[in-house]
Amino acid sequence: MNQIRLFAQSALVSVMGMGMVFAFLLLLICVVRCVGALVSSFGWDRGPDEGVGAAVPAGGALAAAIAVAVHEKARSTS
């Protein structure tokens, strides 16, 4: 009976940890998109001779790099 309780507590802590990581990544993606929209609205992502924005791909690359780092950290601690 004690082993079942320990397993249930461990599973609950794991699910809560994954939920916290998911919420952090979701919040991070929202912040990066908002910053990208702000940069695009002010025109800071365009050079003098460029017609295409660069903030959105850069924000996506940043979000992907942070997601990989968080995933590696979570994998190394478990």
Swiss-Prot record:
Highest taxon above the source species: Bacteria
Record's keyword annotation contains Cell membrane: yes
Transmembrane segments: 12-32, 51-71
Membrane topology listed for this record: Multi-pass membrane protein
Major localisation: membrane
Statement: the UniProt record of this protein carries the keyword Cell membrane: yes
GO cellular component terms attached to this protein's record: plasma membrane
MF term (GO), any: sodium ion transmembrane transporter activity
Subcellular location: Cell membrane
InterPro entries: Na_pump_deCOase (IPR005899)
Keywords: Cell membrane, Membrane, Transmembrane, Transmembrane helix
Gene Ontology biological process terms, A to Z: sodium ion export across plasma membrane
NCBIfam families, sorted: oadG_fam
Protein's UniProt name: Uncharacterized protein TP_0055
